[in-house]
Amino acid sequence: MKASVAGQGVVAAILENNGESWIKYYNTDGTEIASSHPNMDSPGYPMDLSLSSDGLWMAVSYAYEDGGKMKSQVAFYNFGSRGEDLVDNLASSSSYTDMLCPQIETAGTSSWVAFFDNGFRIYEGTNKPKETVSVSEDGEILSCAYADDRVVLILRGESDDHPYRMKIYNLKGKQLADENLDFYYQNLQIEEKQILLTNRQELCVYTLNGRKKYSGVVSETQIHEILGMGQNRYLLAEEDGVSMIRLK
């Protein structure tokens, strides 16, 4: 299951049941606002979804086959007053050939970041969202994240000394950093305006402009999850319990 929660508590989710997919949209009291039953023919298999911060927009990425080619579609649904006169609340959509969009993130009330297997795209609009920025990468993208107006991509590196490469962009598509990484990471996330790379026992922290702040061992067992608590404090969920660390 994949789910997205808007600021006021409404929830949208992709549900799977007996090999079939459903997209459900629920109010704060649990009542159903909308429901759809997409399939591979129309509009495709739902890969991910994201609600706008005000809950009026839902962005959904689909994958489908057309003429023997795999395609993807990014669709935007309006559940405000403007969407009442639209067929199935669909305001706009964009289709792409030979690429998939496994992840889509909301960047406010009228902006979205869609991650593809070859890069990312930015969509903007209050009536009919459309693509405004397109960034493509030649290398293999291993991980991606968005928060605080920053798009972070981890690509496979070109040497054993630097197995990964991190690129940071703003929402205009401007590249802010391109760093070779010697840290063997397993997870990427953005917390408290910091880029966090973790593996079993280690943490590596970068600023949103690509400056390394810390790299070292923070757990004697195994890190399951890490949460930013503000003021350079992080809560570690470890194999044997929970601990708090503070970085100088």
Name each model feature, range by range.
Residues 1-8, 41-52, 90-105, 135-149, ...:
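Repeated scaffold domains used in trafficking and secretory/extracellular systems
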Residues 1, 31-40, 83-95, 128-135, ...:
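A short beta-strand motif characteristic of beta-propeller blades
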Residues 19-25, 66-77, 117-124, 160-167, ...:
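Structural motif
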Residues 10-12, 56-58, 111-113, 151-152, ...:
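Hydrophobic beta-strand positions that form the internal "hydrophobic ladder"
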Residues 27-30, 78-82, 124-128, 169-172, ...:
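Short loop/turn segments that connect beta-strands within beta-propeller blades
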Residues 44, 49-127:
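Solenoidal tandem-repeat scaffolds enriched in leucines and small polar residues
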Residues 130-222:
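Intrinsically disordered, low-complexity segments enriched in Gly and acidic/Ser/Thr residues
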Residues 13-16, 60-64, 115-116, 154-157, ...:
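Recurrent small/Gly-Pro-centered beta-turn motifs in extracellular repeat architectures
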